[in-house]
Amino acid sequence: MKKFMVIMLVISCALISSVSAGDERAAGIVEFISGSFSHRNFTTGHVSDEMIQQILAAGHKAGSAGNQQHWHFTVVRNKELIGEIMENVDEGNVLIVGLGPNESRFPQEIIAFDNALAMQNMFLTAQALGLGTRMYLRPLSNLNQDLLHRLEAPEDHRAIMILRIGQITAVDAVSQASPRHPLETRVNFIE
């Protein structure tokens, strides 16, 4: 989890540093990324098929090692299956399970990284569409072989990450972004 967070921080910093001051579109993207966070207060409400397709397309556009696109996404709307994967999921919420191959010429860390890039694209796209999002690793322990089979996951794949998408309630002090460590305590420069 810590490695994932460090990797995402590096990617975010790289995106921010590549923005020219005069580019309003880029400045808007940086502002959007800086304001995004993992939601905690979801509510009931349908997420349209069109939104899910946009979100999946954004994930599919992510970069990957050797352009291998080490991902398979399983969209779960079935309430019973969602309940077996995680608790307290509101009616209408959708889970996207990111899976990667068990066997590859690339190390499993690369496959997980590729999945994380795709999930981050989907995370941000869902938020741009006005939806709440949250990534999970802990519920992966619930995804045993039987459940993966019922999710129609490819046989040679394992679950890497879960993205929850849904309608959200108003942001409050509990549901807002968690405090960040000061950036200067997480970055060093070598001139």
Regions found by a protein language model. Give the residues of each.
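Acidic, surface-exposed loops and disordered segments
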Residues: 8-13, 18-191
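Positively charged n-region of N-terminal signal peptides that target proteins for export
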Residues: 1-4
